[in-house]
């Protein structure tokens, strides 16, 4: 069994990790930390986990206990993993970080977007960006994995086939993305209150969202050149889900885009390219580690529209983290993740 530690288990990504790992036949959660909830039983805080973690309680983070684990997940706000990751890596423990701490390769760029100096720039050279559909072989050999964000996952998977094939104009990319309220986290905030978010939709961070440099970094690597991206996120009155409507200019009308996408993702267990003319729904991926994609060329013109949907807490966070765990430890990539989405 893989001995697992989780730092920061009281947020939505933390409890989603617990839910997924409870179904994993080769992983056992030995340590879960929370300074504010130390001593509280996991099953008392999350009744949905009763019968799965009845002997596990939250504890104050202890480097010795965490270093005894084979792998430690960080489901924490940005900046926390900076302080602990180096010590764990030195002890031989693998680190899978769900926060943004090691996603950007440039420490100065990270500091610009997150408003504080990067706390462990010396570790950036060791960090592998954990998008399996791009970096699977690097993940197998990694010590430190940076799990992609939710918007970046849906957006990159949608654009990748076009950019890798050199078909899309890289200077004219648009990502119009909608997120459920759980993407804002579990902390109390006026904008996340039911009376504020219900029956309403709004754009936010139009001047620049923290996921913009992460998306741009990935698309730039895929295109092999600089890219121009307009990214506009929206908050929608649902709990889970990301819906990305992606626009790219593709002048070559002879290309069979459906075949291109199907070929690119033919061997990917968690990317579902839907039949031509489809419109994927966020509800179809709720609770599942799946990205569903459909590609369109409206009116046969130069503009290509890609629709990409994920569950922000699963393929956009905790599910993708477990997918990385499976790859890292040489397991079947689908282990503990093959359940279907929840309907209705």
Curated annotation (Swiss-Prot):
<dbReference type="InterPro" id="IPR036291">
    <property type="entry name" value="NAD(P)-bd_dom_sf"/>
</dbReference>
<dbReference type="Pfam" id="PF01118">
    <property type="entry name" value="Semialdhyde_dh"/>
</dbReference>
<dbReference type="InterPro" id="IPR000534">
    <property type="entry name" value="Semialdehyde_DH_NAD-bd"/>
</dbReference>
<feature type="active site">
    <location>
        <position position="150"/>
    </location>
</feature>
<keyword id="KW-0521">NADP</keyword>
<keyword id="KW-0028">Amino-acid biosynthesis</keyword>
<dbReference type="GO" id="GO:0003942">
    <property type="term" value="F:N-acetyl-gamma-glutamyl-phosphate reductase activity"/>
</dbReference>
<dbReference type="InterPro" id="IPR023013">
    <property type="entry name" value="AGPR_AS"/>
</dbReference>
<keyword id="KW-0560">Oxidoreductase</keyword>
<dbReference type="GO" id="GO:0006526">
    <property type="term" value="P:L-arginine biosynthetic process"/>
</dbReference>
<comment type="function">
    <text>Catalyzes the NADPH-dependent reduction of N-acetyl-5-glutamyl phosphate to yield N-acetyl-L-glutamate 5-semialdehyde.</text>
</comment>
<dbReference type="GO" id="GO:0051287">
    <property type="term" value="F:NAD binding"/>
</dbReference>
<comment type="similarity">
    <text>Belongs to the NAGSA dehydrogenase family. Type 1 subfamily.</text>
</comment>
<dbReference type="Pfam" id="PF22698">
    <property type="entry name" value="Semialdhyde_dhC_1"/>
</dbReference>
<protein>
    <recommendedName>
        <fullName>N-acetyl-gamma-glutamyl-phosphate reductase</fullName>
        <ecNumber>1.2.1.38</ecNumber>
    </recommendedName>
</protein>
<keyword id="KW-0055">Arginine biosynthesis</keyword>
<dbReference type="GO" id="GO:0070401">
    <property type="term" value="F:NADP+ binding"/>
</dbReference>
<dbReference type="InterPro" id="IPR050085">
    <property type="entry name" value="NAGSA_dehydrogenase"/>
</dbReference>
<dbReference type="GO" id="GO:0005737">
    <property type="term" value="C:cytoplasm"/>
</dbReference>
<comment type="pathway">
    <text>Amino-acid biosynthesis; L-arginine biosynthesis; N(2)-acetyl-L-ornithine from L-glutamate: step 3/4.</text>
</comment>
<dbReference type="InterPro" id="IPR000706">
    <property type="entry name" value="AGPR_type-1"/>
</dbReference>
<keyword id="KW-0963">Cytoplasm</keyword>
């Amino acid at each position: 069994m893989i001995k697992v530690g989780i730092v920061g288990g009281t947020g939505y990504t933390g409890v989603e990790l617990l839910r997924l790992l409870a179904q994993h036949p080769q992983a056992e959660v030995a340590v879960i930390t929370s300074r504010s909830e130390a001593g509280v039983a996991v099953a008392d805080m999350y009744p949905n986990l009763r019968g799965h973690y009845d002997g596990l309680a939250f504890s104050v983070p202890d480097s010795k206990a965490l270093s005894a684990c084979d792998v430690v997940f960080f489901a924490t706000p940005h900046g926390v993993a900076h302080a602990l990751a180096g010590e764990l890596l030195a002890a031989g423990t693998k680190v899978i970080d769900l926060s943004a701490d090691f996603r950007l390769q440039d420490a100065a760029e990270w500091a610009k977007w997150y408003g504080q100096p990067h706390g462990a720039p010396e570790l950036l050279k060791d960090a592998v960006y954990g998008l399996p559909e791009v970096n699977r072989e690097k993940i197998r050999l990694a010590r430190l994995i940076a799990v992609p964000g939710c918007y970046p996952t849906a957006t990159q998977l949608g654009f990748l086939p076009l950019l890798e094939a050199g078909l899309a104009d890289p200077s004219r990319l648009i990502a119009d993305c909608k997120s459920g309220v759980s993407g804002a986290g579990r902390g109390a905030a006026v904008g996340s209150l039911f009376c504020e978010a219900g029956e309403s939709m709004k754009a936010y961070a139009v001047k620049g969202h923290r996921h913009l440099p992460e998306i741009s970094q990935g698309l730039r690597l895929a295109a092999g050149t600089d890219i121009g991206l307009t990214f506009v996120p929206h908050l929608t009155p649902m709990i889970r889900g990301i819906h990305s409507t992606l626009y790219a200019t593709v002048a070559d009308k002879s290309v069979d885009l459906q075949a291109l996408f199907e070929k690119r993702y033919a061997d990917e267990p968690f990317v579902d390219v839907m039949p031509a003319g489809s419109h994927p729904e966020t509800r179809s991926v709720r609770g599942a580690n799946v990205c569903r994609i459909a590609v369109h060329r409206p009116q046969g013109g130069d503009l290509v529209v890609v629709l990409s949907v994920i569950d922000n807490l699963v393929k956009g966070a905790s599910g993708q983290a477990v997918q990385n765990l499976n790859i890292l430890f040489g397991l079947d990539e689908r282990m503990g993740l093959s359940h279907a989405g929840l309907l209705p």
